[in-house]
Amino acid sequence: MVLFGADGRYLFVWADVEARMKKNYNMHCMPMVVLLNLGEDALVVRRQGYEGVPQNTGLPEWLTDGERGKVMRTLIKHGLIVDPASHVHSKNNLLVEDGRIQGLTAEEPEADVILDAEGMVVSPGFVDIHMHEDPYDPEEGRLIPSIMTSMLRMGVTTAIGGNCGINTVSPLRYLELMDRDGGPINMGLLAGHTFLREQAGHRDKYSAIRPDEQQRLSRLVKEALEAGCFGVSFGIRYVPGVTRDEMVKTACFCQSHGRLVATHVRDDADNVFDAVEELVSIGRQLDLPGQVSHVGSMGGFGQMERLLALIDRYRASGMELSGDCYPYDAFSTRIGETTYDEGFLERYCTQYSAIEICEGMYKGQRCTERLFHELRQTAPDTLTVCHVMKAEDVALALSHPAIMLASDGLMDRGQGHPRGAGAFPRLLCRYVAAGKMNLDDAVAKMSAMPAQKLGLTRKGTLRKGADADIVIFDMDRIRDCATFEHPDRPPEGIEWVLIGGKIAVEHGTVKQSSLGRAIRA
């Protein structure tokens, strides 16, 4: 005997029902065919033990372990629910079922898992719109999670890599690996212009692209967008040979797909205004939304007030323009990048000693002129931190209504800038707890704003039907613990993190590290 049971897009096929009807089949049935995915684009059948079907079957995460067929219910009780997208700020209970938010309730219904959030804040899982994804190991054929784990520990449940024009591997391959293996958090990508430019055959960052290379680049960008990338990212500061024409011919594919253009603009400090104008002019020409990447490190040298006023004027004229910022007054990049080309000391009004080495035999040391030039020649990929930004400019950016929080996290085997492990709790403890920002605005900058910018309607909110990606934190204890000496040290005060309704972090400890999946535009 076979029983069919529909659940939205999924059709479950159960066998051996007669032997089990004495019990609740939702709790005990073993599926012969796990499911038929009746989504808009595909029909996928997955059988127990059949290796011929691809690993990615569109399964909701709650169906991927020994609880197949069981309706999982989680109750988060007595917490302060903060959901800016729904204008909710109240003490209540939150019910989760089958990986989705079922709603708020004053009751305490029975549940498989009950989390007591008394005295804590319950918010949507944080969304990081600007980070740099983990590397790919070609020998093992898998991703090497490092920064994704740090993200999870600080409450990030969804992040976007591929920023500043950089991908670590083909976007198509990366998303396939996330589908196959999962990861600590949900991951989406931007198509990195610089990466794809090199794949198209042009590796000289100081020269213009040739017409045949532009054709190959255009094809690669189109393929990446069709595969689900959320838009195109540019790192023009790192590739000064890129012309405005190349940017237009690359970004134009976002127009037909309705995607985002995120840009590490061409210049910073006193030249940042013309650089932002370039992004805006392209956005207007193509009618595309723009995102100014890490505004703190672009105008955080005394130009921030004027830069934010410029952004306001563009927005008032109808341009969809926003930005992101991390709550630190030091930026990070590799020592061989164009950021450190001749003239940088004068541009930042600084000295070589402002540069701190993040890895290798000189880790923790400040640069001298000799060491700087030695590493530029012999180890150009060495990660550095440059302590040159003005704290007051960073604070000004973070308080602006069009600027959302992002980590710009970049790590190499746990080494790098502490923002990759501390940016989100740092905003809570150093801005909210310190009275510089209200809680709702901070949570919005960490969840609703980036989710809305990306078009992720089921992320960044706790409304009914949303994905149950949730972070529960203690405002009395929340603090970032990552330092420049120990950049991957996890924060305190993050009590639980749920992804798809399942507990990924409990009392600061990672319990499940593969609940995340690829997300696509």
Predicted regions and their residues:
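Divalent metal-binding pocket/active-site signature
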Residues: E223-L279
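N-terminal metal-binding scaffold of metallo-dependent hydrolase/deaminase domains
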Residues: R9, Q55-T57, E61-P109, A442, ...
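Acidic, glycine-enriched loop/beta-strand segments at the rims
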Residues: V82-N93, T384-V388, N438-V443, A451-D488
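Hydrophobic faces of well-ordered beta-strands that scaffold small-molecule active sites
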Residues: V127-I129, A159-G161, M187-L189, V232-F234, ...
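C-terminal cap of metal-dependent C-N hydrolases
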Residues: V388, A395-A402, S407-D408, A423, ...
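Divalent-metal coordination cores built from histidine and acidic residues
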Residues: M131, Y136-S233, M319, Y328
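Active-site neighborhoods of metal-dependent hydrolases
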Residues: R203-P211, L217-F230, F234, S293-K436
